[in-house]
C-alpha cells in the first residue's frame, strides 16, 4: 500500500529535506526510522524539498510498504523512533501511484521577522532579527504587486534548472504581532517595589551580609523606592509575518520575496518599483535572499 505522511520539523540542524552526500537530512531520518519500524527498506519521497535550515509544520511524503500495520497507526509508532525535532503529525493510506508533488496543490509559507531593538535568543531559531523600524504599510503595498501569475525570474536563484520561471501566487498577507509586553521592560521606569520589593530587598540584604557588596554599596543601603530608569525603546517590539500562498514556487523564491519586502520596509526599495523588478527578469533588481531560519512551510492543500 502507499502511505502519505504529514511531517513537521525544526530544520535548524539539518541539511534540508533531500538526502545529501554529506550532512544529516529529514529524508534520511525518516527512511531510517521507517525501515527499522517496518522491517523492510523504505525510501520516502517528499512533496517539498525544503532547504537547509527551513522548517515545516506540514510537509508531505509518500512511501510504499507491505506492512500489515494500519496506515493511520504508523505515525504513532514512527514518532517513537524519530529525533525530537522531527514529528509525523498524521499518516494515511492513499491510492497507489498518488504523489502530492504532482497533484494540484496550494502551499503556504510563512516568513517570520523579529523586529526589535535587540535580538531575542528564544526566537533565534525560528525568525530573522532586524533592528530596522520596518514600514509595514509600505511592505503591504509592495506585496500587492507580487500577487497573481507572473514571471518571477527576478525572485529566483541564478542558475536554477527550471523550464519556466512563471508561477502563480494566489495570496499574500503581512501581519504584525506585538510581543507580549509582560516579557519586556516597557518604556517607563521599573520600580523594585513593583516586583515583590520585600522579597527582593531581603535577598539583597542577605547578599550584603555575606560580603557580596562593596563597602560603599553597604553604606549606601537599599531603599524600597529604588528606581531603575529604562531608556525608551527606539522601535516597538513586534513579530512581522509574511504569509505567501501559491501553486508552486521557484528555488528560494519566498526567501527572496521576504528579503525584498524587508528592503521596502526599511526604505531601500519603493513599493512602486516592484512591477519594474518583476518585468526586468533580473535577479540583481530584487532584494537579498532572506536567511532560512525565518521560513516555515505551514500549509499544504491538495485541490
PLM-predicted stretches and their roles:
Residues 1-211, 215-303:
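Structured-RNA-binding interfaces characteristic of tRNA pseudouridine synthases
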